[in-house]
Each structure stands twice: as C-alpha cells, then as structure tokens.
C-alpha cells in the first residue's frame, strides 16, 4: 500500500485468502487471526498489549502494510491495531508501528514469491526467527511457559489457563507436535486478507449530486422557500453524517480508508479530535492521520454477544509525521475512537 497519499483515499476490502498468503514473509495487510509480525525482534510485550482500561490481554484486530516510498529505513513498514474484546470492557485500543530496511535480518532482499509454498499446511507458527516465542492463544509475545512441558508459551496466566482448559492439559505430553494441535480458543477474530482499491476522484461528486436530487425529489411539491429554509436548518451534524453516507455509498463494503496526511472521514460532528488532542510522538514530531477503520468491519468479526461487545463508528489512526526510527522494536502510535451517536 502506498503512503504519502496526495490524492484520493485507498479503500480496503476483506477477502478470504489461503493461510500462506497471510504469513509475515508475504507482507500482508489483513484482519484477524494472529499478527503476522514484521520485525521478529522487539515485539510489544504483555504490558503494552494489555487493555489500558481492564488490564486483560487485547486481541489482534488488523494490520496494514504501508511502506514509505523514498525511505530506505521504511522499505517495509506495517501498522498493527489491537482491541479489547472482553465484556463488559471492550474499550481498549492500541496501535504499533514497525519498519525495516530492505536489507534486514529477517527477510529476503528480493520480493516474495506469488506461488504457494510446497508445504501449505495449517500449522500455527509460534516461534520467530529471532528465537522469540509466541502465545498459543493470541500469537503475541509469550514470555511465560508451561511448567510441565516447557514448550507451550503464553502472554499471560489468563491465556495459559484458557489453553489448559481447552486441550493443552491432554496435549502437554506431546511436545513434538504442539504447533499442530492448537485448539480454537474463541479469542481470535476471523481472518481475512485486506485488498486495496483506489477511490475514484470524480464519482463522489456525482453521488453527492444524486443524493441531493433524491432528497429534493422526495419532497414532492414543496415550495422553493421551504426547501431553502430546510437547508438553512440542516445542522452541522446532519451535514457530516450525510457526507459520510455519500462517500461510503460508492463502496459500501469498504472496511478501511488509507491516506497518509489526508483528512479523516468522520461519521459524526461529535467527538472529533482537535490538534491538541493528538499527542506528539515521543521523538518530538507531530502525528498525522494515516488510516481509519470503518464500522463495516464489525459485520465480519462475529463479535456480537449478549451485553456489551466490540463497537465503534470510526477508528482513526495517527502516526509520527517523521515515521521515526526508534530502534528495531515496535513504536506505539495513537488511536482516536469515534462512536456512532444517536443523531447518526
């Protein structure tokens, strides 16, 4: 996905894909499953991936592969978004950025093959080239390990207990085959590839005109004076939501809008951030908008539960304007959550 977008947004859509296409060496953009980590070193640890509100481990939501043209140190660059899916919280959000030069310790200098590998099994990859171990439940850094087999790794006691109840108790002795017998913990979101299309620059204006014509047409024989009066009384909230609906009506299945430095598409006039609300990067640079997650993604997550569940109107991600290089690890960036208001 290209960065430094000066034109229209790039739109993301979910598609089913074979598991090999969603592995780290393919540099995927994807939703759900386990993270396809970019750098195999310096992963965010359990404290960084704990919900800032309830303290429980967050689930991987999506990642966007977004290298920066002309930046040798960001030839590979990816953003990873996590959310809390534990009722009744379901509020915590965190996003991390990682980037690598083309010549690095983890990947070939040449582009990855488009052909499937000879072995395309469904084994879960729980060990990285750096030697780091991943949690069997969530695929994040797993510094804890089973005290019996010393082979199964976890991010937390909570995930260790969950895995024990759902099968590791019986599989613990089968230490040579643990990666092939990872149960479904009902913790991960469904996994999809994110495919990208560029939004048409002209069509939004056409749709907006059609939208206005439809509104006027449904008013029947209303007098011109009445129409002018209604236009004057249309609230800012109404205009913002109408713009949102008009934009997404072109591609109603879009789950993501990407454009580094463009303006976000808000769903509401309420709870939109001012410049002072977006914290600067620790390096001192300002943060700018990079992409947003649309509410349409919720339709694919199978996250509905009785009581509170994962929900949002817009998740807007702001990243360091300099895309600074702070070591080989993962740098936390900023997420702004805008909920769907009653007015919308």
Swiss-Prot record:
Post-translational modification: Ubiquitinated by PRKN, promoting proteasomal degradation.
GO cellular component, one term: cytoplasm
Major location (coarse): nucleus
Gene: PDCD2
Recorded GO MF terms: DNA binding; zinc ion binding
Function in brief: May be a DNA-binding protein with a regulatory function. May play an important role in cell death and/or in regulation of cell proliferation.
ZnF region ranges: MYND-type: 135-172
Source superkingdom: Eukaryota
Name of this protein: Programmed cell death protein 2
Keywords from the UniProt entry: Apoptosis, DNA-binding, Metal-binding, Nucleus, Ubl conjugation, Zinc, Zinc-finger
Localization in the cell: Nucleus
Binding-site positions, Zn(2+) 2: 146, 149, 168, 172
Transmembrane segments: none
Organism annotation: Bos taurus (Bovine)
Family matches, as Gene3D superfamilies: 6.10.140.2220
Binding annotation for Zn(2+) 1: 135, 138, 155, 159
Gene Ontology biological process terms in this record: apoptotic process
């Amino acid at each position: 996905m290209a960065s430094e977008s000066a034109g229209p947004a790039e739109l993301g859509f979910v598609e089913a894909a074979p598991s090999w296409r969603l592995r780290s060496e393919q540099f995927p953009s994807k939703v759900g499953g386990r993270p396809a980590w970019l750098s195999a070193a310096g992963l965010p640890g359990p404290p960084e991936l704990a919900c800032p509100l309830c303290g429980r481990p967050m689930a991987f939501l999506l990642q966007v592969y977004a290298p920066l043209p002309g930046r040798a140190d960001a030839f590979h660059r990816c953003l990873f978004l996590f959310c809390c899916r534990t009722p009744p919280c379901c509020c915590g959000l965190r996003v991390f950025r990682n980037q690598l030069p083309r010549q690095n310790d983890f990947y070939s200098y040449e582009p990855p093959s488009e052909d499937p590998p000879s072995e395309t099994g469904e084994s879960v990859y729980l060990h990285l080239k750096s030697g780091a171990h991943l949690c069997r439940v969530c695929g994040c850094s797993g510094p804890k390990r089973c005290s019996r087999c010393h082979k199964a790794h976890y991010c937390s006691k909570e995930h260790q207990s969950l895995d024990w109840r759902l099968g590791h108790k019986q599989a613990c002795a089968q230490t040579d085959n643990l990666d092939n017998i990872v149960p479904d913990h009902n913790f991960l979101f469904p996994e999809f590839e994110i495919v990208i299309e560029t939004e048409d620059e002209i069509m939004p204006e056409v749709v907006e005109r059609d939208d206005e014509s439809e509104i006027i047409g449904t008013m029947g024989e209303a007098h011109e004076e009445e129409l002018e009066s209604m236009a004057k009384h249309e609230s800012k909230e109404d205009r913002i939501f109408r713009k949102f609906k008009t934009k997404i009506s072109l591609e109603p299945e879009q789950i993501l809008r990407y454009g580094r430095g463009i303006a976000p598409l808000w769903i509401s006039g309420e709870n939109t951030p001012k410049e002072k609300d977006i914290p600067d990067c620790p390096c001192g640079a300002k943060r700018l908008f990079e992409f947003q997650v649309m509410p349409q993604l919720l339709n694919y997550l199978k996250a509905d539960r009785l009581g509170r569940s994962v929900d949002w109107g817009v998740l807007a991600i702001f990243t360091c304007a300099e895309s600074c290089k702070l070591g080989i690890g993962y740098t936390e960036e900023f997420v702004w959550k805008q909920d769907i208001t009653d007015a919308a």
